[in-house]
Amino acid sequence: MRVILKEDFINLGKEGDTVDVKDGFARNYLLPKGFAVFSNKHNIDIFNQKRRAILKRQETRKKIALELKAKLDKVSLEFVMQSNDGGKLFHSINSLNIADELLKLGFEIERRKIDIHYGTLKTFGIYDVTIKLYEGINAVIKVEIKREEKKKSLKKSKSVAKEV
């Protein structure tokens, strides 16, 4: 089924593009959610009239993405995590954790735009994480996972002696 996109979609197309998608994807997701319209003569004429505004909007998004990339390339995140004696983390780091930390720094990034090359981060170390900002514009941030220092308990162990 041919549809015209009303929004940019990663791996599908940009706003105003006419794309071929499976019928079920169009009927069950794109059309009901308002992300696309049927590709017919009337809708094509409407989008041709809006083409200049769409291109201007895309240029604005690209400019904003480049500015955001310059800021994000300087960012490094640090997570202090607990682990077992073998060095395996009790809780892995995923895109939601990274998005929350970026939000604390003032960057509102959707978690689906964060690409952790390893799926989730489960061991200590420094990792490069890619953030997809716009078509062809990606920022790379450093994520460091450090070990939380274990607190040594100062309690004296009591020994219980039983007489037999």
From Swiss-Prot:
GO cellular component terms attached to this protein's record: ribonucleoprotein complex; ribosome
UniProt superkingdom: Bacteria
Keyword set includes DNA repair: no
Keyword Glycosyltransferase: no
Name this polypeptide is given: Large ribosomal subunit protein bL9
Function, as annotated: Binds to the 23S rRNA.
GO molecular function: rRNA binding; structural constituent of ribosome
Pfam families per the UniProt record, alphabetical: Ribosomal_L9_C (PF03948), Ribosomal_L9_N (PF01281)
Xref: NCBIfam families: L9
Keywords, alphabetical: Ribonucleoprotein, Ribosomal protein, RNA-binding, rRNA-binding
Organism: Borrelia hermsii (strain HS1 / DAH)
Family the entry assigns: Belongs to the bacterial ribosomal protein bL9 family.
HAMAP family reported in the protein's UniProt record: Ribosomal_bL9 (MF_00503)
Any GO BP: translation
Database matches in SUPFAM superfamilies: L9 N-domain-like, Ribosomal protein L9 C-domain
